[in-house]
């Protein structure tokens, strides 16, 4: 299954280099930052925002900091060993974890590059967008 595959993959990677450091370097790279959509930076600042991803949290910590997002929810993974802790954070599990982290919530706008994996979140959102190469396309379920 995907969770086992990710554990093996990250476990092998962790043997070769620091997963946290590599992720930090990736997000600090100007080429990576240049690919981030302007729409994100131009968003209304009065709404709470959460990054919720199937990626390991250590991969996105620097991104959350750069983007000014205070809440990050991702797949739990030991960055030293690469072993996943618990379930992969996608689909219904992602919805559950968001609720666990923030309590009762509503999704005003949902942005994703994977409509299939994030179907439950798109279905719960007032507005949904598919992001392709930084371009937003309204989701039509």
Listing of model-derived features with the role each one plays in the protein:
Residues 1-20:
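Alpha-helical membrane-targeting segments
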Residues 21-141:
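C-terminal cap/substrate-recognition subdomain and adjoining C-terminal extension
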